[in-house]
């Protein structure tokens, strides 16, 4: 959903019920959807995943094999007893920071970096269940800079992540741009955002309704006051390919990959360390539970990077639960939020020139391939967040909320008859202000938090990983000032609001 949390009201995308406004008008006939099944995407997109597996073979070090690395490791080696840095979370942010630590260190047999991932199938990982968008159309300079630098990285990805004697990396980037639509109510906010984007170097055009209609004749411009269209570095790509490219390269540089779950921290606190101030601690060990085993392996370390995606908040809650009474950790407000994605077929739809469109209502869609398929969804209304205890898909949500809005904006979508497939994934949602959290924890200074990006972590992962590595290695980052994204803002500061959260 595109919104800024100000007084509970949307700024760019006014929210209404499914019957409020023309964007929520009910259509006259029901839409058939497939029977709700937890595994829709894996059942219906099985052939695609099979092709993906073949494409990934050889993309990882031969000691593991690409596709096998995405399955449970039957004989995964335990983690080493000592590490300089333990990265908790093997998603794209975790592997990005691991890669950058070894790259910027620039010496062989240097620091020992271990990435711990509890689910090597990535069955619930935000990375691989993402729709893969990248844009610079944000309202905050930090987000614009991170996405611009990430776009540059992706354009030159083989200069960074290619492994000698391996095939070139192809993330299947589709440079079709993002198209944000604003109503009269949201026009000023969108125009102010474009001004900041241009100041930061992003190429974004403002379109009047007549210009919008001339460029995209299939759009119904009713209630659209202005639109912004990304001219460069925007579109979408394959998240699997980026994740595996980071992982493959990092492992070739000597990063250890470990399957397991970090269950607890052992830390110096005022209770067990003379001179340690109360309320502050320093992690000495992490305990890693090995797969299918009650055993836990302690790993001594100097730094912990908490990059567990939607479970980063839960990680710190559970891992610090056993610390002594002098250290009561403030809760990190990063939590999972379930989001649905639907795929439909519409041969008479917008076609190959389709951008990633964000409607005034908050509904979105983009083209999926070249055979008349599209995917899209929207965030649920406030107060109607779905249960995060499973990844079941609510098919009624598409018929009652998503489809009416998109069919109003794109009349060709009125003719679609059935959703082909659907899946659910998790946002690593920062409930405080929906922006990334990047920096050392105030109470555990050697625990570096990297998460809470609320839907834009994948696209910013190349730059965010580099910034995190530079802060850890050098204490500063010249390229992007991320001081305002530090964890300290989460307690007692004003929210750092981003107007363009989808």
Task: List the predicted regions and their residue ranges.
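Active-site lid/adjacent beta-loop-alpha segment flanking the redox-cofactor pocket in flavoenzymes
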Residues: 331-333, 346-446
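C-terminal catalytic lobe of FAD-dependent flavoproteins
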Residues: 404-502
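Dinucleotide-binding Rossmann-like beta1-alpha1 core, especially the glycine-rich loop
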Residues: 131-215, 362-364
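Glycine-rich FAD pyrophosphate-binding loop
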Residues: 102-127
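Central helical "cap/lid" subdomain
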Residues: 289-354, 395
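Short beta-strand to alpha-helix junction loop
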Residues: 141, 145-148, 180-189, 229-251, ...
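Extreme N-terminal leader/targeting segments of oxidoreductases
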Residues: 2-85, 100-111
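A conserved short coil-to-beta-strand element within the FAD-binding core of flavoproteins
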Residues: 209-211, 258-284
């Amino acid at each position: 959903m595109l919104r800024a949390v100000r007084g509970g009201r949307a700024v760019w995308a006014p929210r209404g019920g499914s019957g409020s406004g023309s964007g929520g008008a009910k259509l006259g006939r029901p839409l058939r959807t497939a029977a709700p099944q937890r595994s829709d995407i894996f059942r219906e997109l099985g052939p695609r995943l099979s092709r993906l597996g073949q494409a990934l073979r050889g993309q990882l070090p031969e000691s593991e094999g690409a596709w096998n690395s995405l399955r449970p490791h039957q004989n995964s080696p335990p983690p080493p007893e000592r590490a300089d840095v333990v990265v908790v979370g093997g998603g794209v942010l975790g592997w990005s920071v691991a890669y950058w630590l070894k790259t910027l260190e620039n010496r062989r047999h240097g620091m020992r970096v271990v990435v711990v991932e509890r689910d090597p199938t990535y069955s619930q990982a935000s990375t691989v269940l993402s729709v893969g968008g990248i844009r610079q159309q944000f309202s905050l300079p930090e987000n614009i800079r991170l996405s611009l630098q990430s776009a540059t990285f992706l354009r030159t990805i083989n200069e960074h992540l290619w492994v000698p004697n391996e095939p070139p990396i192809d993330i299947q980037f589709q440079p079709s741009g993002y198209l944000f639509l604003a109503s009269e109510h949201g026009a000023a906010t969108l125009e102010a955002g474009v001004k900041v984007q241009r100041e930061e170097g992003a190429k974004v055009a403002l379109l009047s309704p007549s210009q919008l209609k001339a460029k995209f004749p299939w759009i119904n411009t009713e209630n659209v006051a202005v639109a912004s269209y990304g001219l460069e570095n925007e579109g979408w790509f394959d998240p699997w390919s980026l994740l595996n490219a980071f992982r493959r390269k990092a492992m070739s540089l000597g990063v250890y990959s470990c399957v397991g779950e970090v269950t607890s921290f052992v830390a110096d606190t005022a209770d067990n360390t003379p001179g340690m101030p109360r309320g502050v601690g320093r992690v000495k060990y992490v305990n890693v539970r090995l797969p299918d085993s009650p055993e836990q392996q302690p790993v001594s370390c100097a730094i912990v990077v908490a990059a567990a995606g939607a479970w980063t908040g839960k990680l710190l809650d559970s891992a610090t639960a056993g610390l002594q009474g002098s250290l009561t950790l403030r809760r990190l407000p990063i939590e999972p939020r379930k989001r649905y994605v639907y795929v439909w077929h519409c041969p008479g739809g917008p076609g190959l020139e389709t951008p990633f469109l964000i409607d005034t209502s908050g509904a979105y869609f983009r083209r999926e391939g070249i055979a008349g398929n599209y995917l899209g969804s929207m965030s649920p209304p406030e107060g109607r967040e779905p249960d995060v205890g499973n990844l079941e898909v609510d098919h009624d949500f598409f018929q009652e909320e998503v489809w009416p809005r998109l069919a109003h904006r794109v009349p060709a979508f009125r003719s679609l008859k059935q959703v082909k497939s659907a899946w659910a994934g998790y946002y690593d949602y920062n409930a405080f202000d929906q922006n990334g959290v990047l920096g050392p924890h105030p109470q555990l200074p050697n625990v570096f938090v990297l998460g809470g990006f609320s839907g834009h972590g994948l696209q910013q992962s190349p730059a965010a990983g580099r910034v995190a590595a530079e802060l850890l290695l050098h204490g500063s980052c010249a390229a992007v000032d991320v001081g305002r994204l530090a964890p300290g803002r989460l307690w007692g500061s004003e929210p750092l609001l981003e107007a363009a959260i989808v």
